[in-house]
Amino acid sequence: MLPRRQEYGMKRSGGARSGSVINFRSAMKLSSGRRSSAVLPSLLTFLVIVASGGLLLMIEKGMLNGMETPSPRSNGRRLDFHRGQAGGRSPDAADLESQILQEIRNRTIKTMCSHKNMPHSVWSLSLLQRKTLLQHVLVNDKHRFLYCYVPKVACSNWKRVLKVLSGALENVDVNIKMDHRSDLVFLSSLKPEEIRYRLKHYFKFMFVREPMERLLSAYRNKFGEIESYQKKYGVEIIKRYRKGRAKDAAITGDDVTFAEFVRYLLDEDVERMNEHWMPIYNLCQPCAVSYDFIGSYEHLESDAEFVLQHVGAPPHVHFPERQTWYKPVTTETIHYYLCSLPQKLLRELLPKYILDFSLFTYPLPNTTAAHCRH
């Protein structure tokens, strides 16, 4: 087990930090009215029982039978992560909240991935599953880490960091168009014995994001801004799902509605989806890979800094700041798009990403008719 980290806020030095701790950052937040209040120990017990027992019941009743791909697995470590007084909360309240959420996540992951139908190594995956995974894991031999990148979860910035660490870029702020293939080493390019060694001995991490927020980010970006996606996917979607347009040669694909996009997703096999909207568990297979750290998009800066500290990145290497043109997907935006969907589509969409919600402890969005009227 890695040593407990002290003084998280200290500046990085050239070598690996001796006072580090690995943890899974939970993205689920307690209600704002309780942020500064202590939580009774009995609540911890209750939530753990509900989370692990409820999901186990889902498995036993076959509610996840349609999800043939594996769900994430914890590496079994007891994990702590101290953020000091971030968000105005006292350290004690923040630590207790983190402890509760870590217990829920760890028990949930352990329960789901211990099921007999779940693979427990890269080599027990199907050929397609293993190909997808290995093509999404980036390797840095100098600092001995593996990073499973997830599109729409700051992966472009992480690729910049990897290029700086390898010497391909001078710094992360260089103003160039990101090439997502060059100067990067993918696990898929290595021999089986080289893959096994790195999976066993290297620090492994990934980052997650609220599933519907990630999906909306992909939809708005790819169909609103990227012409190649409009031509490749948009034209097909409109011809398939918009009445009277099946043979329309004038379709440009730049006006795909969210409902049309969702209909397309529901007809797609999750294992063959485009990586930008493929569920995270299909991309990174955390049941088959025991990740040492799972960071969250919601705490991107602090989680990224922790990773850089742990792998011993030089002090001048920092995680890039968000671009000035960045527009976050707000809670109101998610509410607007989801509530605009017919209830039938909504009921079918959420189960498509149910493992991303449950394993990474993201609460399902409230899409009841009463809530959507507000």
Q: Which positions does each model-derived feature cover?
A:
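Membrane-interface amphipathic segments in extracytoplasmic regions
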Residues: L2-H374
